[in-house]
Amino acid sequence: PDIPQIVSGLYNGMTTGAPLTIEFANRDTHSQDYANVMRHYRPSHADMVAYHKFNGFNDPRGGGHFSARLTVALTAAGVVAKKILPPGVTFDTRVAEIGGCTDPEGFDEVLRAAAAEQDSVGGIIECRVQGVPLGLGQPFFDSAESMIAHLLFSVPAVKGVEFGSGFA
């Protein structure tokens, strides 16, 4: 399990204003699995782009900072953010689809089949937020939707974001 260790920015249960540093030690590493990544880039991964962007000086073990391990840090940041939200802001989330399957009873089978094929599947996660203060964000580039989309696209697996009625 990923156990957080708070390194800085917290004192007596309160944030101090200093940078909040949370460390998650990864005890499940398999660096040898990435030995061929520099010669055979993985489809839909950042391996090739990282190699060229950093002139071959990137560390391919585990995908580096392009890894899905980034998700644990984003989740930790989300936990902290939820604690500082104003009262009345609520979230309702659900997994709406996995690999084309919309029946929650079938999700496990879709995931097992993908794992057996050593493949991955896409999905749709729905999040509804209520009680958001009026006037949140700024015009144009810093609108609430722009900032939320920017953050969501920081998650490596995210390929699309919908607001309101979505793409319909």
Language model: regions and residue ranges:
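Generic N-terminal targeting/processing segments that precede catalytic cores or assembly contacts
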Residues: 1-168
